[in-house]
Amino acid sequence: MSKRSAAGSGSIRKRTFTRKGKEYTYWEARYSVGYDPGTGKQIQKTITGKTQKEVNQKLKAATVAIDEGTYIAPSKMTVGEWLDIWSEEYLGNVKPLTVSAYKTSIKNHLKPNLGAIKLEALNTHTIQGFYNALGEEKEDEEPLSAKTIKNIHGILHRALKQAVLNGYIRYNPTEACILPRIVKKDIMPLDEADTKLFLEAIKGDPFELLFTVTLFTGLRKGEVLGLTWNCVDFLRGTILVEKQLQQEKKKKGKYYLATLKNDKPRSVTPAPWVMQILRKQKLKQAEDRIAAGAAWSNPDNLVFTNPLGGHLVPWTVSRHYKEIVASIGRPDARFHDLRHSYAVAAIRSGDDIKTVQGNLGHATASFTLDVYGHVTDQMKNASAARMEAYIKDILSA
């Protein structure tokens, strides 16, 4: 009877191959990880490397892991593939709304940045770099808040915890990551005086109508740049916000129309004056189309375009905005503050928080109140002061 090889035993040999007439050399180790219980045949695995030393180190590590019972067979599964499996098969006890939020974060953040990495190769340093990058301000987009990054971390941590339980990876690399401290950022809206100066400064500017619509609708930059004419209903006086302009997560990535951050389209009813601004934009675009002639191309039917019908570049819009606000003494103002300006103006005009939440596309009214609660507090104080004056007037009569 032949003697069985012990699990973990292996041999190293030098291998060569020829490609395009040139000979290449590498080292290979084959080792046993045990026997198939069904067939009784030996299960063989292979390790390769550029040098004998590299392969020998890998073989020793695999042998130790086999002896200790911690060995995990190499897998070609990527992080993206595992996230898809996990989100479809391991969230049966999670509310549908939460599952939807998980899938949105996976699609918008985790897969574009980590999806192509082999699951077993994902490490703490890579994940930490990903978290840090999410919190950095870029020219064409706002940084994610510390709270949002923490939520994304929670999803990844949970998915990788299951991968450990399934035996796909030895440990959860998110465990050692350092999350940013959640600091509530002050909003910097344009006040009434700033708004008047801003509107005066953009008169005749190429982006005048774009800036004006953003200021008085509260649309995010990606939403206003991704707005299409089929979503503008002049008869009803409404705007359907269902898309946003995004760039592929790679160097010089192409721009495309994507679904919203929360995958929830919303209908906004702006002031009639804003709809008139959009009519002006339609006329301006028609003039641009005539001037461009055969060079015109607007396949997505975008509302705001360059002179040839193409999409506007987000960082160009932001840079030009910064030049405008600097000229009126507000160099600290960001493009996103146009959204804050709309929200504050709406609340002070008497809109309730629920209405403002719906127009802004926030997930909950509590989030809207958390961001703009100080405005309602100021209004309450002003109301109390008016009532105080009224009471004193009555008592002194």
Region locations from a protein language model:
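Basic/aromatic DNA-contact patch characteristic of tyrosine site-specific recombinases
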Residues: 1-77, 81-89, 103-104, 129-132, ...
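Short, basic (Lys/Arg/His-rich) helix/loop patches that form interaction surfaces
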Residues: 138-142, 200-207, 217, 268, ...
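Catalytic-site neighborhood detector that most strongly recognizes the C-terminal catalytic loop/helix
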Residues: 181, 185, 189, 245, ...
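Short, polar N-cap/turn motifs at the start of nucleic acid-interacting alpha helices
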Residues: 231-238, 331-332, 351-373, 381
